Amino acid sequence: NVTGGGLLKETSDNYYTAGTAEEFLNAIQSVKKSGKASVIELTADIALGDKEVNNFDSYSSFITAHKLEPLTHPTLLKTGVSMLKLADMSNLTIYSKNGAKITHTCVDITGSNNIIIRNIEFDEIWEWDDYTEGAYDRNDWDYMTIEKGSSDIWVDHCTFYKAYDGVIDVKTPVNDSNITISWCEFLPASEDNVFFDEMMNAMKANPDNYPYYKHLLEEGMTDQQIYNYAYGQKKTHLLGQSDDDSSAKN
């Protein structure tokens, strides 16, 4: 039953609260070790970039630096972007009562079942694409990827801002995957536009450092037109292995 994952009382030994990145990762580590139905309540915003988490390498069995490092965003160049792997896990709820935020990570749910992710905001895995001139084909940063036999996954009442690639990708799903995405918001740019504006302002101040941005200006676009062009999300969901793979299901 997709709604049954990790429903525990707050007094349970397997109910964890996390207000920092380290507390959250320690909770994941404990859940993986115990193998028991568990809840992780996120009580504050956490940032999971590989350059900003204390003792990051000590969690390397399930979170690593993303293989494609940031190239242009001033914040991400400092924080890095990570890949959080929820692999071979079951009966786990990750939620927040207050809509806490997770930034600078891509969540990969692999070979897992009965997972609930609820009332969490995901933000800040986008940067301007000079490398492929706006095609956004390099970084492969998605907020969430569900793949390799994962089933009974419920993503509910979450908020997702602009991502470099996709927002939620479900790769090679089968008819009985039971993957539900409900009552979620998919929004442009970033919360209050702060993270998004930082990137746009950096380009405006130093156009020579961003060849594709400079090219658009030289072709007659205004700063505001480029801002509007970059503001929206390229794509949201993908059901299948890739856009053109024969296994893609529309």
Range-by-range predicted roles:
Residues Q29-K36, G49-T93, K101-N119, E124-S150, ...:
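Extracellular beta-strand-rich solenoid/capping regions of secreted or surface-exposed proteins
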